[in-house]
């Protein structure tokens, strides 16, 4: 069974507009965030692997497909590892939590998609992970 999980949120709409939320997100571990603006749907941003960094992914605009591989051996990973594929959309207000130990890659499904990424490591630590 996968260690990757969704944290479900919701979308509330009335005459004033729309609120997208993920009220069950516990932000105690989060040290930083960054935003990816993916204009081109032909570009794949991959493979970023982190032994110790945990990440939370939230689509602000558009949609993305993410592929994640649990690394079995950091010195000599197996070549036959199978990716887990997840689809994320701004139309579904939820966060994908990917624990440490995974390689990841993303592809925007729509032009000008925006992905918000939270991390449990500051940049100076994450760069060396």
Q: Which stretches of residues belong to each language-model region?
A:
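Non-catalytic, conserved peripheral segments adjacent to functional cores
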Residues: 1-91, 111-114, 118-129
């Amino acid at each position: 069974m996968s260690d990757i999980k969704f944290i479900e949120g919701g979308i509330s709409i009335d005459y004033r507009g729309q609120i997208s939320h993920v009220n069950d997100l516990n932000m105690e571990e989060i040290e930083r965030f960054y935003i990816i603006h993916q204009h081109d749907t032909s570009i794949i941003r991959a493979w970023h692997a982190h032994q110790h960094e945990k990440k939370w992914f939230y689509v602000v605009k558009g949609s993305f497909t993410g592929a994640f591989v649990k690394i079995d051996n950091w010195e000599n990973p197996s070549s036959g590892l199978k990716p887990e594929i997840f689809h994320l959309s701004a139309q579904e207000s939820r966060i994908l939590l990917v624990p440490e130990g995974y390689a990841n890659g993303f592809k925007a499904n729509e032009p000008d998609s925006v992905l918000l990424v939270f991390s449990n490591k500051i940049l100076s630590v994450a760069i060396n992970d």
